[in-house]
Amino acid sequence: MQPFEEAQQLVPGLAPKPDLVCLSHLRWDFVYQRPQHLMSRFARDRRVFFFEEPIFEDGPARLDVGERPGGVRVAVPRLPHGLPHGEVEAAQRDLLQGMLAGHGVSDYVLWYYTPMALGFSADLAPAAVVYDCMDELSLFRGAPPALLERERRLLEVADLVFTGGQSLYEAKRERHPSVHAFPSSIDAEHFGRARRPCPEPADQAAIPRPRLGYFGVIDERIDLDLLAAAAGARPDWQWVMIGPVVKIDPETLPRRSNLHYLGMKAYDELPSYLAGWDAALMPFARNESTRFISPTKTPEYLAGGRPVVSTPIRDVVRPYGELALVEIAEDPEAFVAAAERSMRRLGEGAPEREAWLAQVDEFLARGSWSRTFRHMSDLIDGAVLRRRGGPDATN
């Protein structure tokens, strides 16, 4: 039984909420991040369908729909190799409409993570349209040329625009009448496990200390030159990099005996790795692709009780750097110095650690994923009511 069905049984007469159909450029089974946190919570009180970008393979077009833990139904379009470009969106449209009909989805909120999905969904009739802009996708490597025009059209039809950070909010707020900033939130209980003794993962156990680690996607947003220089400056420190390598050639990764690439790990495994680090890293490059990012790992590292060092990414400097929760450093020399300083001041047993952790916890308490979900859900309820012409107290 679905979580929302259980809720309806517990509260007889509870009006069902519209289903939620999410159109995403990210894979559900890839890195666990904002879409998974939010959609798994929405699935507690409504049906959620997560429609991914297509996979091209041999055979006729089909849609694989499977349920994930928590109740989200993940739909993966599989399209034939060699399908002409002009027919790809038509095939996606057919598969999406077939899914809606086959699952009896008639009253639903349409939630976009990518404006490109407008090409096969513009003729639908949702109860409300949400654009959750978690990144400035047009600045990423390989962005489709049509993306900016699609975003312009999406902003015209959306009822609500959510942004993944303050910088994105400032970039979008003049382009739509209802833009709301929802920066990276946190499951503090999950990552708080790193503050307690954890069994060492087998592939990290033999790596000496001190360990400085990163988890997340390794792509054009990582400053590989900074990483190489910092690792070279401190050969006695071990630099642990966890996550998939995408959009860059793995051969371009710096290689040293104290640099360890451990690959992608499941979300449930991350606290165990984090617990074995002496500091956590965000060695982001300063380029167009990082201009608007609001890294989810910032609060995750902090919830795990690790001192954090980051390059001056705007949404990290403000608020984390300004509140002295995170050390900010721009070049390799400053990065190494900041890491050394933060480990000395804030590491296990350090004199300032307890006061810093208290400040961290006070800050993180205001930004849980559950709190973000509730606020978003209230805004969506209001948008649905407005479309239906009913009373709305949610402004």
Q: Where would I find each of the regions flagged by the language model?
A:
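N-terminal subdomain of nucleotide-sugar transferases
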Residues: 1-59, 231-234
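Nucleotide-sugar-dependent
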Residues: 29-33, 222, 268-273, 280-303, ...
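Membrane-proximal helix-turn-helix segments that form the acceptor-binding/catalytic region
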Residues: 97, 144-161
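Carbohydrate-associated surface elements
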Residues: 167, 185-194
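Conserved donor-binding/catalytic core segment of Leloir-type glycosyltransferases
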Residues: 203-222, 227-231, 240, 365
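Nucleotide-activated donor-binding/catalytic signature segment of Leloir-type glycosyltransferases, i.e.
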Residues: 248-274
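Conserved acidic donor-binding segment of nucleotide-sugar-dependent glycosyltransferases
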Residues: 324-333, 340-348
